[in-house]
């Protein structure tokens, strides 16, 4: 029996033998495609090649592409665990032709592979074609010898693929496997086609047209091929299984889950084990590709998947985090094909453990709320959308988790109501976004790129150089000339100006043309992937395409940027050494004045840890050793120990930057990373490194801000000055400042406690002796009511408790007045709760001070109002309500 990894290798090897470039899987986060949440098909990384926006060296490719379908249009999440073939994560095997071979060779390859390499019986296979595609029908007869009854014409869009309303499109042909009459279901196109007897295993897309509009379609000059075969699906067939979860990979993952949870995958537990195994894959691969759990966008989808798996672990009796314990099993199954699992293992385990601990803290409360909300509901009823949204917003329950919990009760959720509440929150929180309207659309830059090609970057050698003007984009359109005072983006055949990328900001400077024209560069950005657009204004003269100029980036500014960029590499290495190998870069910004570095870590970095990080970085700076740069393939670089950004897509060659000597092993570089930015020549050029801030960015993401060189020195001088000024004010030596401040803080706390006690005695009616004044009687019950100046709402609870204890039986009301506002609290002893409700009494008082409502329990309630001057009126209103 062939294993899943063997089947993957057989597919790729077959096409490699037929002159296809084996392309590694792209990251799950699409590169430069905001229309997609995740890569959900094998062709997605090749989209620009099919549209002609990107030229490939090879016209043939094959890949096993990681895919996720768990959000948006393609959302399989609800079905996962309960069906035979739904997954959130899957691998798509595919072969692609970019204007090279077409239908005949594609069909020939497909038939040879499934019947020859995979050994599937021809009599078990049938195909579909688009009803109007007679060419494909004839080719299947010719190549496979299929009879007409096994070539089914489909006239719907199921067999005609398009990229969108416009663009490349064409008919499809699908290969189906027949499981035999023992399985219910009919062939494709029949009324019972949704049964499980006939399973699609491969889809061949023949891109032969370009859709120009609703009714306008033309032939492509160079037709292309895009095919997709689900690895899990074909593995099940080749292993003689009817359910993907019975294949070797899933059996091994489920066995690991059984071992960790101590529960067999059978009966009611089977679906939960399958959910955990599937979601483990999508969770780990998403994080390995740079996605972090959050409450929005891709991070929210990741958290939804995580929490669904964690809830199923809870159903199986997990009393502590368990998902992180399964990462090693996943690495054993898939780490050879996807080495990012091993590189990210520490991050995956730590994040899963922290997320599950966080979820377990809220799970009980959320499930209790769900039980209360459904207590009076019956089978077939729908939970209110507002309640489902409260579960999401307050307890972190994604909608599908709530739906999953209700499934066993035969209940549903009012999704429209949930979406309405979600939309309202987003509308309330969304900040206004503005755009200048001057930016050129991508189509303009792709057109420019086709004409002029990439910009050669010469800035590694220095900040000056010469270049020929190849493009002018002004007002969002291409131009041939530019006059004085006009703003534009200029492109040259080569430039020393660095275009913003990799977190490093773009260069500024000046461009002087040979005829005397001067262009001031305010920023440099990358357009169309690899063109450097110099953004600014022509301050003198006129220019036209083809003009030659001297380009000079601001050298002092670049030097500061170089120091800060190199410092981010050293800081990254130090963070990993001090905090742990789970630390990975999650973003950065390198400017001339400071650097910002975001990284994965689940708690704040302590002062001692910050000091240790600074000490390591400054030790490497003092080594003053040369920084080395080499170019190599990404695989070779990673094999050599270089750190790569999770989820980043690299080209055929990468720059590998090595800095410093290992603090324990001088033969090993302190930092080795892939980077295309500009850097110092020696570590000593950084001069000094100082962290000035450490904050949280989001759940599991921390940020440090730091300065280097002269900026760091000035910052430290300023901080020392603040310390000296504070020491002078306290009349103490700087060395004793911390001790003196701590003593003052303790003294203040003591005085605050004494003041609070004095206020409490005063509020209870006591004089200097502290003896409290007795209660009055209203409507036959004891009542203590006071207005207390300078007391906030949080301090009233203690006064209420003391008054109730003093009376034994009675009602207490206190109104604190602070900063002109009133805070009210009312307490009722237990024996009187049937006669008086604290909430009703506090509402009466709140109305008198301009407040609305009030909340709490029958025995204790609080409220507030804006008019503290009417506090006595509020107390009178409570007395009146008590009197009835």
Curated annotation (Swiss-Prot):
Protein name, entry field: Alanine--tRNA ligase
Reported function: Catalyzes the attachment of alanine to tRNA(Ala) in a two-step reaction: alanine is first activated by ATP to form Ala-AMP and then transferred to the acceptor end of tRNA(Ala). Also edits incorrectly charged Ser-tRNA(Ala) and Gly-tRNA(Ala) via its editing domain.
Residues binding Zn(2+), per UniProt: 565, 569, 675, 679
Main location: cytoplasm
Annotated keywords: Aminoacyl-tRNA synthetase, ATP-binding, Cytoplasm, Ligase, Metal-binding, Nucleotide-binding, Protein biosynthesis, RNA-binding, tRNA-binding, Zinc
Cofactor note: Binds 1 zinc ion per subunit.
Gene3D superfamilies tied to this protein: 2.40.30.130, 3.10.310.40, 3.30.54.20, 6.10.250.550, Bira Bifunctional Protein, Domain 2, Threonyl-trna Synthetase, Chain A, domain 2
Leader sequence segment: none
SMART domains referenced in this protein's UniProt entry, alphabetically: tRNA_SAD (SM00863)
Domain notes: Consists of three domains; the N-terminal catalytic domain, the editing domain and the C-terminal C-Ala domain. The editing domain removes incorrectly charged amino acids, while the C-Ala domain, along with tRNA(Ala), serves as a bridge to cooperatively bring together the editing and aminoacylation centers thus stimulating deacylation of misacylated tRNAs.
One Pfam entry name: tRNA-synt_2c
Gene Ontology MF terms: alanine-tRNA ligase activity; aminoacyl-tRNA deacylase activity; ATP binding; tRNA binding; zinc ion binding
Originating species: Maricaulis maris (strain MCS10)
Claim: DNA damage is one of the keywords in the record: no
Location in the cell: Cytoplasm
Required co-factors: Zn(2+)
EC id: 6.1.1.7
Keyword ATP-binding attached: yes
Record lineage: Bacteria, Pseudomonadati, Pseudomonadota, Alphaproteobacteria, Maricaulales
Catalysed reaction, written as an equation: tRNA(Ala) + L-alanine + ATP = L-alanyl-tRNA(Ala) + AMP + diphosphate
GO cellular component, one term: cytosol
UniProt-listed PROSITE patterns: AA_TRNA_LIGASE_II_ALA (PS50860)
